[in-house]
């Protein structure tokens, strides 16, 4: 079994090498798609690719970001690999805490073709802000940002199909032919909030994107600063905290979103049905009038 990663990056110079090095502990190849980085990220990944042939530059474009960039990379390389191989959607600011391959082998043994991760969101807190001017910027992001909560889950792994493409008009984390979910999930450290400057730039990029990141557009500009006392402190080599109450809160929120989504869809179907009934009545009345005339 081979594990290949797809990594889309834009202006992640402060963390991209740490992300790639972490993933290279278990990935056979990492295919990088640079979305017009201007902060030195492009130069860093080019140098990395020169020194490590497992890092492959798949594309470099100034197109507006779309989730379908992942589809494009998959379509470029999927026929190079076997049915037993897997793909890893590697976000440029994420690092798994463990090798996922043993879990992927178990997923295959159970005839599954998709696996999610639990996301440990690492926050820039009031404690980080107070110490920011004095902190050692030479330390890695994971050494400087320690406060987290595990509160989200997303698909990150899917099984390869040598014969099937991933249509580029479809959005989503995994292809539509990979819907058999393996429920156990590894934990992924997500460093979306690293410095005040990076947080501001990240938000601006997302606000200016007409196609994606609607969840960001619904938040205020000052929503990012978290209180350290509301988080757990990460120490490498120790088990991460994931209380049962946090799991309940997550599943409750997902149930709420699902019910809202179902209600909206039922309402839309009802409106469509009423519209069709009205059109049919008009059609029947017109035909009856023409017949009687």
Predicted regions and their residues:
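Conserved donor nucleotide-binding strand/loop of the catalytic core
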Residues: 50-68
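Catalytic-site signature of metal-activated, phosphate-bearing donor transferases
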Residues: 68-74, 98-293
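Short, well-formed alpha-helical segments that are part of the catalytic scaffolds
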Residues: 11-28
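A conserved acidic beta->alpha catalytic loop
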Residues: 34-45, 61-65, 91-92
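Short beta-strand-to-loop acidic/aromatic patch adjacent to the donor-nucleotide binding site
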Residues: 82-97
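Active-site nucleotide-sugar/metal-binding loop of Leloir-type enzymes
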Residues: 71-86
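Conserved beta-strand positions in the Rossmann-like core of class I SAM-dependent methyltransferases
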Residues: 31
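Cell-envelope/extracellular polymer assembly enzymes that use nucleotide-activated donors
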Residues: 2-4
